[in-house]
Swiss-Prot record:
Belongs to the heparin-binding growth factors family. Plays an important role in the regulation of cell survival, cell division, angiogenesis, cell differentiation and cell migration. Functions as a potent mitogen in vitro. Acts as a ligand for FGFR1 and integrins. Binds to FGFR1 in the presence of heparin leading to FGFR1 dimerization and activation via sequential autophosphorylation on tyrosine residues which act as docking sites for interacting proteins, leading to the activation of several signaling cascades. Binds to integrin ITGAV:ITGB3. GO terms for biological process: activation of protein kinase B activity; angiogenesis; branch elongation involved in ureteric bud branching; cell differentiation; cellular response to heat; epithelial cell proliferation; fibroblast growth factor receptor signaling pathway; lung development. PROSITE patterns: HBGF_FGF. It comes from Ovis aries (Sheep). Gene3D superfamilies: 2.80.10.50. Keywords: Acetylation, Angiogenesis, Cytoplasm, Developmental protein, Differentiation, Growth factor, Heparin-binding, Mitogen, Nucleus, Phosphoprotein, Secreted. GO terms for cellular component: cell cortex; cytosol; extracellular matrix; extracellular region; extracellular space; nucleoplasm. This is Fibroblast growth factor 1. It is found in: Secreted; Cytoplasm; Cytoplasm, Cell cortex; Cytoplasm, Cytosol. One of its GO terms (molecular function) is S100 protein binding. The gene is FGF1. In the nucleus, phosphorylated by PKC/PRKCD. Residues 127-143 are annotated as: Heparin-binding.
Length: 155
């Protein structure tokens, strides 16, 4: 190619339709607020724990489309969801309440906004004591909504 020439590439129009499989390794979502790992318990409760060996903190993130993810517990098989009151809970089946908009912030932490309640800006969040924070009580700029995806094993 000579200097000054421009090459144009065709846009990909095909869909890959990747299965909801394990194409990524499970992650731990570490919250900046108090140092808790997001946890989905077998009874559907969602909270945080500082115990890195807790099996309920291993989460699989599945991309529905660009920037949209499902978060599923590898231990319980439940999907993280947010109800109409902004309460986080574990759901046995994926639904519109389970879809979150994932965004990488300037500080290199991720935030997750409920897609169903995106116009209200309801984030996944953990309080300083490790309990889940209601969506309406969250807003941009809080440490409670900042999560760092970490590998399950430290090696």
């Amino acid at each position: 190619m000579a200097e000054g020439e421009t090459t144009t590439f065709r846009a990909l129009t095909e869909k890959f339709n990747l299965p909801l499989g394990n194409y990524k390794k499970p992650k731990l979502l570490y919250c900046s607020n108090g140092g808790y790992f997001l946890r989905i318990l077998p009874d559907g409760r969602v909270d945080g724990t500082k115990d890195r060996s807790d099996q309920h903190i291993q989460l699989q993130l599945y991309a529905e489309s660009i920037g949209e993810v499902y978060i599923k517990s590898t231990e319980t098989g439940q999907f993280l969801a947010m109800d109409t009151n902004g309460l986080l809970y574990g759901s046995q089946t994926p639904s519109e309440e389970c879809l979150f908009l994932e965004r990488l912030e300037e500080n290199h932490y991720n935030t997750y906004i409920s897609k169903k309640h995106a116009e209200k800006n309801w984030f996944i969040g953990l309080k300083k004591n490790g309990s889940s924070k209601l969506g309406p009580r969250t807003h941009f700029g809080q440490k409670a909504i900042l999560f760092l995806p970490l590998p399950v094993s430290s090696d």
